[in-house]
Amino acid sequence: MSYYAFEGLIPVVHPDAFVHPSAVLIGDVIVGAGVYIGPLASLRGDYGRLILEAGSNLQDGCIMHGYCDTDTIVHENGHIGHGAILHGCVVGRDALVGMNSVIMDGAVIGEESIVAAMSFVKAGFQGEARQLLVGSPARVLRQVTDQELHWKHLNTKEYQDLAIRCRTGLSETKPLTQAEENRPRLKGTTDVKPKSAQ
């Protein structure tokens, strides 16, 4: 793992969290229990504090950063999709930020809200609970349905379980030169399906 102290501040990582070896954590970063941090994520706590609360996930290629005297926070069970950027913002409990979305300074995503993939949430946006945000700039489309929230919970559970699986089942290796006959398929721990398959 790439952990760097910055001006005396050392990242804090709960022993039950999983941080991929290619992720980078610098300075004032606090990672809670059961958190999953994916490959190539960058958490640059060289100005503001970065906090990932228990059960949250920050997937492949995500960036967290913020200005001095600010906290960038992903609250409990927050779900941050591949390639998203969080800058000086707050993501509420059980909220989901879709792939390649950008959440700007001072923005607050309400608890149990969903930010659609590729959305841009402007600085200072103050969200409420269970909002579906879509577009660039993002606007509130409607309330998140119970079915959508259930789908989000299943996805987050997969990443919470993946943190455990990676701590015990991930190891560096050399590739095979060809696929073996009857190559097994990996399984998740829930019955979650892509939204298009629902």
Swiss-Prot record:
The keyword Nucleus does not apply. Residues 174-198 are annotated as: Disordered. It comes from the Bacteria. It holds the Pfam family Hexapep. GO terms for molecular function: transferase activity. Gene3D superfamilies: Hexapeptide repeat proteins. Keywords: Repeat, Transferase. Residues 180-198 have a biased composition (Basic and acidic residues). Pathway: Amine and polyamine metabolism; carnitine metabolism. GO terms for biological process: carnitine metabolic process. Overproduction of CaiE stimulates the activity of CaiB and CaiD. PANTHER family: DYNACTIN SUBUNIT P25 (PTHR13061), GAMMA CARBONIC ANHYDRASE-LIKE 1, MITOCHONDRIAL-RELATED (PTHR13061:SF29). This is Carnitine operon protein CaiE. It comes from Salmonella typhimurium (strain LT2 / SGSC1412 / ATCC 700720). The gene is caiE.
